[in-house]
UniProtKB/Swiss-Prot annotation:
Any Gene Ontology CC annotation: cytosol
Family named by the database record: Belongs to the UPF0246 family.
Official protein name in the record: UPF0246 protein Spro_0686
Origin species: Serratia proteamaculans (strain 568)
GO biological process terms, semicolon-separated: response to hydroperoxide
One Pfam family matching this protein: H2O2_YaaD
Length: 257
């Protein structure tokens, strides 16, 4: 089973590390090409491109300038411990054992605008480069054209290494658009998380993001490898809704909190 999640805009390079082990990202040659393009952007251009404040644009211009492999624990941090958004709140990797990290390293992948695909223990320097932005490059007008089939190829390599053929898509639409589903060597499963509000069930962004992290945690902690095992997901009040699930879309509902 291969679990795919999105990165986060918020980063944490301060908290104590849950593990000292690390690996290097596998697509750094591609990342270098993007950094070269980004270094030519002024803070004003970065602000406009990313829709962020002048202060954040200045910070990210500095990050592009400081970026340099080879990464070390002194200048970088493991991806799973560096990202800090709602998904990662649900994942809560801070209490992972070394065995948990071993399983995650094999079965979890984070998509990234700059790094393409990250394994949990891959070191990364801080950055902001969302997959959906329009960044001119040699391959086209955006990062989807830049990455092409590279991301799908890496995901297939991971599937081949683990000998499984189940892919759990817990990434956002913006990020999963970088994957070519027809070329994935596995059955694609998409969990959907619905929360009750005023008597109606719907996707509530904050809760849905956290739930993606919770399901990732559930898979890692319980060493899941089969599609059927996902139906037992029950963290924080969610339960499988067979009646509303269709094909490879698995619906999980939670009553109003």
């Amino acid at each position: 089973m291969l679990v795919i999640i999105s990165p986060a805009k918020t980063l944490d390079y301060e908290s104590p590390l849950a593990t000292e082990r690390f690996t290097q990202p596998e697509l750094l040659d591609k990342s270098k090409q993007l950094i070269k393009i980004c270094r030519d952007l002024t803070p004003v251009q970065i602000s406009k491109l990313m829709g962020i404040s002048d202060k954040l644009a200045g910070l990210n211009a500095a990050r592009f300038g400081d970026w340099q492999p080879k990464f070390t624990p002194e200048n970088a941090r493991q991806a799973l411990l560096a990202f800090k958004g709602d998904v990662y709140t649900g994942l809560h990797a801070q209490d992972f054992s070394e065995d948990d990290f071993d399983f995650a390293q094999q079965h979890l992948r984070m998509l990234s605008g700059l790094y393409g695909v990250l394994r949990p223990l891959d070191l990364m320097m801080p950055y902001r480069l969302e997959m959906g932005i329009k960044l001119d490059n040699a391959k086209g007008k955006d990062l989807y054209s830049f990455w092409g089939e590279q991301i799908t190829k890496k995901l297939n390599e991971a599937l081949e290494q683990q000998g499984d053929d189940v892919v759990v898509n817990l990434a956002s639409d913006e990020y999963f658009k970088s994957v070519k589903p027809a070329k994935l060597h596995g059955e694609l499963i998409k969990p959907v998380f619905l929360d009750e509000k005023n008597g109606k069930y719907k996707v509530i962004s904050f809760y849905a993001k956290k739930a993606r992290g919770l399901m990732s945690r559930f898979i890692i902690k319980n060493r899941l490898t089969q599609r059927e095992q996902l139906l037992d997901f029950n963290l924080e009040g969610y339960a499988f809704d067979e009646a509303n699930s269709q094909g490879n879309e698995l619906v999980f509902k939670r009553p109003e909190q």
